[in-house]
Amino acid sequence: MALDSTPWFVGGGAQHSPEVARALAYAATTGAEGVSGIGDLKVQAQAVPNGTVRVLPGAGLLLNRYAGGTGQTYSLRNATQTDLAVTATGSGGGRTDLVVARVLDPQYEGTAPADPTTFQYSRVEIIEGVPAATKTAKELNLSYPAIALARITLPASTATVTASMITDLRRVAQPRRERAMMTVFPSSTLSMPTAGYSSWPLTTATRPAVSVPIWATKVDIVAHVTGVKFTKVSAVDTVAGIRTGFGSSLPAENSILIQDAEDSGGRYNYTWVGTHTVTEAMRGTDQVVNIQAVRSSGTGLWVADYQTSIVLDWEFSEGAQ
């Protein structure tokens, strides 16, 4: 196969092909596909549910799935909210529909538009009657570029689309990640709480406040705590609950620690692991990374002191929301 005669970008009046431009988009985005931002092209029921759904503004990247289009990417944008009519179901049964963003390219479709300046080359539309478990447009083996935005599951005899019928299928094309780590050393001897969850072996003074990226939707927290002193007091198991915290997000429990009755006292290492949703209100603010514990049964004693180290590792990530 010969090279395209004109690379991107040559001056002097050279004619540039759409294939080379799409190849540039593919290379620049490493072949990624999906929506551009966390809220882009989200499909929602109307504020007052009716027989339509709304597709919010946003942008997306679509791989060229026309025959001969390998290694090319389209970029589309929905500038304003778009409403789509959903066909009502009859009494004979329900139906599953797929809302997609797609490209219609006359170069491959074979029919030139009557007016190329007003033709709608990109559009959002509904594909009716797809398999109930459909998650991507690729599963349908379409012969054109498309990405799945949402699945609508309609019961029989339904003309009104509610939020509970819509499953969000969007994926961010190039999700961002940001990771950081720090080590904390206790400045005093700290016994594990026994009256309820509290920061341990961190304290109010040593919990780090971290800057939350404006694009983050999730944070994963891992804490490795080494050199914790355990003192065996009686011949029964000692159990503790542990959990990670992020801002005001404190789950009931992430895990437990158990020192069996057969264990001897000494220094032990433990790990906290947790995942937290980053809410819209948290983005662009400083939030505290925290780990907590409480002894829930038994009489053994866990103590952090000058021989203890706490390695905190957190990673923000981005996903459609």
What are these regions (language model features)?
Residues 143-147, 157-160, 185-205, 263-269, ...:
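Solvent-exposed, conformationally flexible loop/turn segments
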